[in-house]
Regions:
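Terminal targeting signals and extreme-terminal segments of soluble enzymes
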Residues: 3-281
Length: 281
């Protein structure tokens, strides 16, 4: 579901859509919401990070004030049509003393395009520890803007530091931010982080990636450890874990510029390398 696929864009659409617009949902009866199509994207299919963020936003609108998203797991089941609205149906699995669990189905024409499970918690002070540290990379202020396909579509800015590990087609380590200001609501900001989390792929560092073609997302999990502001520069650092059975999996971390670990993520994608008959023995 990455925006870095070889998607056909409508060049006549020149004004990027804001992420804030994407997260504006129309409430419907019975814990349902509607996300209207955003025609200015110029896309034929929906970016997976968009619908995941919209589903998480819908869930957040059904929990008590003060409960903030801390994890989500989405399955991408069908490609979505960017010209059509999305209906988001929320199921209230549990509301406990501190935690709330939700499931969300995103549908178009009664067909599920995404299924998401997520959890919210009332913030609490606790032990602070992170084993992974911000990589030693150039700060965004020393870099020039990198043109992602997504930057033509949404109000995003990317900058790519020098990377000692080679990558193919998609940068696997990059600074990202949302340009237009999001509300200070911590759940809206969490949705903004989720929106950014699916823009590239750690499989760009995997062996034989140049033979794999498109690598649409199958499922995507994000754990939100600390509050962050996606209007500030965030470093997304992605690394492959392995490929097998026509699929690949990678993990990643998202840091703020000060080095705080804001989120961790894991994604499985298609990784279909054509079988070479000459390799048979």
């Amino acid at each position: 579901m990455s925006l870095q696929s070889r998607e056909v864009f409508d060049a006549s659409q020149t004004m990027p859509t804001t992420v804030n617009e994407v997260l504006q949902l129309k409430p419907l009866p019975h814990d349902r919401f509607s996300a209207e199509p955003v025609s200015s994207t110029g896309r034929r299919t929906i970016y997976g990070g968009q619908v995941a963020a919209q589903a998480l936003r819908a869930a957040s609108l059904t929990v008590a004030d003060g409960r903030v998203a801390h994890s989500m797991h989405a399955y991408f089941l069908r490609a979505g049509d960017a010209s059509r609205p999305i209906e988001l149906r929320v199921e209230r699995d549990r509301d406990g003393g501190r935690y709330s669990g939700r499931r969300v189905s995103a549908l178009q024409d009664d067909a599920v395009i995404l299924s998401l499970a997520c959890s919210f918690a009332r913030p609490k002070q606790g032990a602070e520890f992170q084993a992974v540290q911000l990589p030693k990379v150039q700060p965004p202020g020393e870099l020039t803007t990198y043109q992602l396909n997504a930057s033509r579509t949404f109000d995003l800015e990317a900058r790519v530091p020098q990377d000692p590990d080679p990558w193919y087609r998609w940068p696997a380590r990059l600074w990202l931010r949302i340009r237009n200001t999001l509300p200070e609501d911590p759940n809206v900001r969490a949705c903004g982080v989720v929106f950014l989390s699916d823009l590239c792929t750690g499989l760009s560092r995997a062996p034989q990636v140049e033979k794999a073609g498109l690598m649409p997302s199958l499922d995507h999990a994000v754990w939100l450890h600390r509050a962050g502001n996606p209007n500030d520069w965030l470093l997304v650092d992605l690394n492959p874990l392995g490929t097998s059975g026509g699929r690949g999996i990678y993990s990643g971390h998202i840091f703020d510029e000060g080095g705080a670990l804001l989120a961790s993520l894991t994604q499985e994608s298609l990784f279909d390398v054509p079988h070479d008959a000459s390799d048979q023995r």
